[in-house]
UniProtKB/Swiss-Prot annotation:
This is Large ribosomal subunit protein bL34. Keywords: Ribonucleoprotein, Ribosomal protein. HAMAP family: Ribosomal_bL34. GO terms for cellular component: ribonucleoprotein complex; ribosome. The lineage of its organism: Bacteria, Pseudomonadati, Pseudomonadota, Alphaproteobacteria, Hyphomicrobiales. One of its GO terms (molecular function) is structural constituent of ribosome. The keyword DNA-binding does not apply. It holds the Pfam family Ribosomal_L34. Belongs to the bacterial ribosomal protein bL34 family. One of its GO terms (biological process) is translation. InterPro entries: Ribosomal_bL34, Ribosomal_bL34_CS. The gene is rpmH. PANTHER family: LARGE RIBOSOMAL SUBUNIT PROTEIN BL34M, MITOCHONDRIAL RIBOSOMAL PROTEIN 34 FAMILY MEMBER.
Length: 44
């Protein structure tokens, strides 16, 4: 059985990137929560 994590920069950006987050209401909440917490990195 192969490992489940097969890294890909493109897939990572598309699924978890800033623009992907901003595209949905829930994603915008995630960014807002991370901003409020003072996270250095907001998204992938």
């Amino acid at each position: 059985m192969k490992r489940t994590y097969q890294p890909s920069k493109l897939v990572r950006k598309r699924r978890h990137g800033f623009r992907a987050r901003m595209a949905t209401a829930g994603g915008r909440k995630v960014i807002a929560a991370r901003r409020a917490r003072g996270r250095k990195r907001l998204s992938a």
